Amino acid sequence: MSCRSLSKEELARVFSVVLTEQPDEVNLSVHDVVAMGRMPYTGFFGNLGKDDEAMVERALRLTGMSAFASRGISTLSDGERQKVMIARAIAQHTPVMLLDEPTAFLDYESKKTTMAMLHAIATDMDKLVVVSTHDIDIALRHADRFVTIGGDGLRDLAKADVERMTGAMG
């Protein structure tokens, strides 16, 4: 089946997306932002049922953000906001998560923690987690497969191939 044949609603049940740019949801709590991930199942008005609420709570717990649930999103650090956006993607409950530079604004320890969390999500929840990054060191520590984009198009590489390439670059 081609993605082109899917409606927006169907796409939202297959792909969850975390972008580099984080929206300023000034008047929303962390819980409300994560609950937005349930929109493909609850509709525009977002009336959460018991199962939806359980998915939101699970996503908050998995990302370590449960204690922040009632806080306003605008009061959080960049790293905390990134965890909220990842929690929203988890709550969306899709088989594929796409993340654009999820460690872009994070310190080194937070980068490692975030990538380890994403790897655990892929493994424990049987999801395809696709991360775009320029941080080869972090990717080498946590990724199972690599796809590079260059003048010759897409290349699917094993970890050893990437290590050889980066070793040759110095």
Residue ranges and their predicted role:
Residues 112-124:
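Helical segment within the ABC ATPase nucleotide-binding domain
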